[in-house]
């Protein structure tokens, strides 16, 4: 074979190799282009669907008044007349009940969609997402009260079969009453931590509204939210803000508070005592509460949370000093000289004792620090009480 022929064959083989490599590259590009084409076709389909949806005419919002047997229902447009309309075949009938919010076709007024229930953002904000970090071990001197609270709230939620076997209904609600700073709110937080339930906390004054009917609507939506999130514990702090005794002569604002109270009474009458919604309320002024609120069937169990006795004060001091470095501190002496102090006072005393130690650049707390803290906390309270009393005597 001549040199020219050898050169020709080498060039031919190289060219064939090049063409094969080029074919593989083109095939890869074709596959990539086909994948891009499929992706763009899906995007085009999505955009066309979105465009079609946006071009649909708006629907009316209405409320179901009554569901009829022949695939029809009576609905009411907001602030408008009532209509007998058809129900679209894709609507789930078991979810279509009186009070449900629905979308109505603009031409035929047929029910075409079920809408979620509307709730005031204030009500949604009442739900506590994270469980409080307070446990039963963080509460001192309230063993009897904690036992009664757990029997009334925790036991029916965890073991409802016990009440069914005995044949009694558990309490619907519990009222905690007593002086300020004695642990009422702390008990509710500890219960919410221990029970695997939704915890809704609301202060009574948050349910008072300016315009007619707003407070009652908030109470209704509060209980609706509790039923949806069941099992649920509703804690109403400072309930005397809406639960005070009703008088014959009232102003416009007081009448609105009375409407809110009546809605609360109606809601508590309306739910099953064996259900998964429990109500706890707290107040410092049980003497001004309306008698209708305290009758059996509403707040069935009244639990007094008094000022702690000597043993209670000692337990509370142990709770608040368990992470403190103490040196030659006799807590029994501190408990003895703090008669009449609340749990909040004792916590303040422990904090002030620590502040006295920090002031002197010490990492431990002594008996002298506690004695100075007792004088500072309880002494200031007594001085303030004397000033208020003398002011009332002088000025009436």
From Swiss-Prot:
Name listed for the protein in its UniProt record: Proteasome-activating nucleotidase
The family this protein is said to belong to: Belongs to the AAA ATPase family.
Subcellular location: Cytoplasm
Subunit architecture: Homohexamer. The hexameric complex has a two-ring architecture resembling a top hat that caps the 20S proteasome core at one or both ends. Upon ATP-binding, the C-terminus of PAN interacts with the alpha-rings of the proteasome core by binding to the intersubunit pockets.
Main localization, broad class: cytoplasm
Docks into pockets in the proteasome alpha-ring to cause gate opening as annotated region, ranges: 394-396
Residues the entry annotates as binding ATP: 181-186, 320
Organism: Pyrococcus abyssi (strain GE5 / Orsay)
Pfam families the record matches: AAA, AAA_lid_3, Prot_ATP_ID_OB_C
Bilayer-crossing regions: none
GO molecular function: ATP binding; ATP hydrolysis activity
Keyword entries, A-Z: ATP-binding, Chaperone, Coiled coil, Cytoplasm, Nucleotide-binding, Proteasome
Coiled-coil regions, chain positions: 16-57
Organism ancestry: Archaea, Methanobacteriati, Methanobacteriota, Thermococci, Thermococcales
CDD domains reported in the protein's UniProt record: RecA-like_PAN_like
Role summary: ATPase which is responsible for recognizing, binding, unfolding and translocation of substrate proteins into the archaeal 20S proteasome core particle. Is essential for opening the gate of the 20S proteasome via an interaction with its C-terminus, thereby allowing substrate entry and access to the site of proteolysis. Thus, the C-termini of the proteasomal ATPase function like a 'key in a lock' to induce gate opening and therefore regulate proteolysis.
SUPFAM superfamilies for the chain: P-loop containing nucleoside triphosphate hydrolases
GO term, biological process aspect, one: protein unfolding
